[in-house]
């Protein structure tokens, strides 16, 4: 998920910013942000590898102003209007609670729709084996947080 300070969207698109926000809510055009500053996780992190591959496939060279080891730091800097970052949607759902955003939120959240940026979280366990209370609770919490109420078949 590309996390963009609203001030950047306003600066780039001016009077069309509202229309562009709606359009980009189903997938962002990364090229529109070519000249804006980016704050990314340091290389060596799986998220950064995915982001770098995405940039490469789209022939996009970000104007990188800072690399950090902490995703929360990148998000805080985006909230402060310093730069654009890219965070895993799972992180945003569990840490930032994107569902409770309001019009006063200083950020725009634009999904990256490239299939290579989409991952599934899978919890596997053997049905014929004992699953601890903690294991059951983890699955229940994951389903609640991620909004998936249906139990997936696990079976290896």
Residue ranges of predicted features:
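Structured helix-beta-strand junction loops
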Residues: 35-36, 58, 80-81, 118-119
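Conserved sugar-transfer catalytic core signal across GT-A, GT-B, and GT-C glycosyltransferases
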Residues: 29, 73, 119
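Hydrophobic hinge/microswitch elements
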Residues: 44-105
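Short Pro/Gly-enriched coil loops immediately N-terminal to beta-strands
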Residues: 1-8, 13-17, 32-34, 112-120
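Secondary-structure junction motif
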Residues: 10-13, 17-58, 131-139, 149, ...
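Short, well-ordered beta-strand segments
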Residues: 39, 85, 122-124
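A late-sequence structural motif
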Residues: 106-152
């Amino acid at each position: 998920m590309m996390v963009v300070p609203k001030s950047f969207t306003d600066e780039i698109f001016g009077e069309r910013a509202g229309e562009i926000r709606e359009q980009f809510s189903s997938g962002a055009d990364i090229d529109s942000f070519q000249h804006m500053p980016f704050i990314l996780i340091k290389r060596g992190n799986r998220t950064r590898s995915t982001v770098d591959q995405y940039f490469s496939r789209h022939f996009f060279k970000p104007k990188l102003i800072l690399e950090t080891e902490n995703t929360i730091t990148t998000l805080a800097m985006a909230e402060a209007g310093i730069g654009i970052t890219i965070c895993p949607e799972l992180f945003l759902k569990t840490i930032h609670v994107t569902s409770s955003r309001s019009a006063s939120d200083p950020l725009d959240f634009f999904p990256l729709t490239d299939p290579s940026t989409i991952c599934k979280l899978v919890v596997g366990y053997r049905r014929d084996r004992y699953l601890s209370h903690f294991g059951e609770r983890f699955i229940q919490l994951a389903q609640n947080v991620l909004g998936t109420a249906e139990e997936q078949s696990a079976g290896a």
